[in-house]
């Protein structure tokens, strides 16, 4: 997938992995996705720069909160969609694997002239723990994980590694996405798999779960010719950025 060798399924098969994620917890390796850090002199500068590329409010995003976003092109289509979070002194983004090279180039071309650096994090892995028991699994490593709300982001220790964790996912279920230093990825993953409710799940189940939840996949459901309104993504565009809003326009 996108030039990466990825497991479509493990020994129990797609259906089993799908159902297990819905009833317990599935663990997905999504390290092929792009992880990017945007950093200006401060968050406000970085946020204002990113707002020149997307129809979302960035400046009002609270510290340690995450938001869904997408780039638009000059024809009103979607260049790519992604997640972004306010980490205090920088913005952390997760972009699609199939688009990450284009996204990073686009960000550099447009943000670096505004004084914002764009760093591709090639030294971190990314996994997703999804399903109703995922909180219970992580509580064994960090009991306060239960205080995290949907779309909260925090830095927590798992198996001795400093991990960046968001309460979010691509399944429509409760879950967490976990960015791990590459050298600790195997240790952290193995530790989570030791929990009796956790099983590995592949790309097949990831696709069926997101379809069941009605979540878009770039390149299949949305692309550069699809408008956000036609895609049912009007909810993601903030009123302040649209016609008549106090920050209207000024994005492609």
Residue ranges and their predicted role:
Residues 43-55, 79-86, 129-138:
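Charged, low-complexity, helix/coiled-coil-prone segments
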Residues 29, 81, 177:
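Acidic active-site catalytic centers that drive phospho-/nucleotidyl reactions
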Residues 14-23, 71-81, 111-114, 157-165:
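Short amphipathic beta-strand starts and helix->beta connectors
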Residues 27, 35, 68-70, 83, ...:
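Conserved hydrophobic/aromatic beta-strand scaffold that supports enzyme active sites
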């Amino acid at each position: 997938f996108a030039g990466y060798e990825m497991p479509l399924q493990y020994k129990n098969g797609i259906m089993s992995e799908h159902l297990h994620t819905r009833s317990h917890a599935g663990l997905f390796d999504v390290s092929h996705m792009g992880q990017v850090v945007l950093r200006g002199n401060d968050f406000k500068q970085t946020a204002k720069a990113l707002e020149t590329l997307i129809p979302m409010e960035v400046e009002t995003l609270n510290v340690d909160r995450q938001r869904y976003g997408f780039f638009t092109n000059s024809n009103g289509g979607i260049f790519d969609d992604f997640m972004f979070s306010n980490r205090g002194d920088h913005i952390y983004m997760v972009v699609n694997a199939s688009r990450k090279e284009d996204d990073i180039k686009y960000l550099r071309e447009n943000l670096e002239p505004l004084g914002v650096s764009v760093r591709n994090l090639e030294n971190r892995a990314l996994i997703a723990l999804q399903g109703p028991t995922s909180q219970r699994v992580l509580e064994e490593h960090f009991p306060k994980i239960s205080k995290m709300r949907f779309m909260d982001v925090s830095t927590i220790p798992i198996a001795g590694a400093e991990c960046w964790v968001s309460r979010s996912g691509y399944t429509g279920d409760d879950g967490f996405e976990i960015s791990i230093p590459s050298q600790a990825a195997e240790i952290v993953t193995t530790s989570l798999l030791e929990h009796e409710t956790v099983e590995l799940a592949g790309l097949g189940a990831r696709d069926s779960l997101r379809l069941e939840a009605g979540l878009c996949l770039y390149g299949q459901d949305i692309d550069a010719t699809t408008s956000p309104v036609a895609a049912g993504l009007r909810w993601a565009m903030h009123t302040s950025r649209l016609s008549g809003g106090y920050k209207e326009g000024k994005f492609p």
